[in-house]
Amino acid sequence: MGRERSGIVLVLCAPSGTGKTTLTRRLLTEFPRFAFSVSYTTRKPRNGEVDGKDYHFVTVEAFLRLRDAGFFAEWAEVHGNFYGTPLKATLDLLDEGRDVLFDIDVQGARQLRASLQRGRYVFIMPPSRDELEHRLRARGTDDEETIARRLANAAKELREARRFDAWIVNDDLERAYDELRAAYIEETLSPECRSAFLDGLLQGWND
């Protein structure tokens, strides 16, 4: 009959400090069908990050060579570092029927939507500017200049929220995760997603 359905694309965007990474990890744990899109980046690894698992860490020169060769489905410069999503690896996963989860910024989301022409795009929002600033300070990893830059970038990113398919305010982690989970399940039930399953059912009638 063929596989149950085709792979889907789920894209999460959020200002830094909104809780996107926590939500992403929970989704990957609950749904083994997900494959996480491992981005390439020129930034330095943070404590605990593993090359090839969290990111592919490369030099600026190597990144630019890959970009110019058409290697990326999307790429962007964020906070002075480059990030990019490998195109072929993404298409291979989707062809295998895997669902692919992206954790990218709004620039990348625009490019990815144009490149792949598919998927559910979800924007994770902080409850307020004050709460976002509190979370950034509580992390204890950024200096004042970096915090100010992240807040300024957050304001720009929030203006892009209307371009997304769904918005989730993360003022309560459990509720935010329930909403994200529902958005994913809704996408898996869409006619576009289940076209492979329908093709398999109809094949026997066409013989």
Curated annotation (Swiss-Prot):
Q: Which UniProt keywords apply?
A: ATP-binding, Cytoplasm, Kinase, Nucleotide-binding, Transferase
Q: Which PROSITE patterns match?
A: GUANYLATE_KINASE_1, GUANYLATE_KINASE_2
Name the enzyme group at the top EC level: transferase
Query: What is this enzyme's EC?
Result: 2.7.4.8
* One Pfam family from the record: Guanylate_kin
Q: Which residues form the Guanylate kinase-like domain?
A: 7-185
Protein name, as recorded: Guanylate kinase
Protein family per UniProt: Belongs to the guanylate kinase family.
Q: What is its main location?
A: cytoplasm
Compartment(s): Cytoplasm
What domain of life is recorded for the organism? Answer: Bacteria
Q: Which reaction does it catalyse?
A: GMP + ATP = GDP + ADP
Q: Where does ATP bind?
A: 14-21
Q: Which GO terms describe its cellular component?
A: cytosol
What function is annotated for this protein?
Answer: Essential for recycling GMP and indirectly, cGMP.
Q: Mind listing the GO molecular function terms for this protein?
A: ATP binding; guanylate kinase activity
What Gene3D superfamilies does the database record attribute to this sequence?
A: Guanylate Kinase phosphate binding domain, P-loop containing nucleotide triphosphate hydrolases
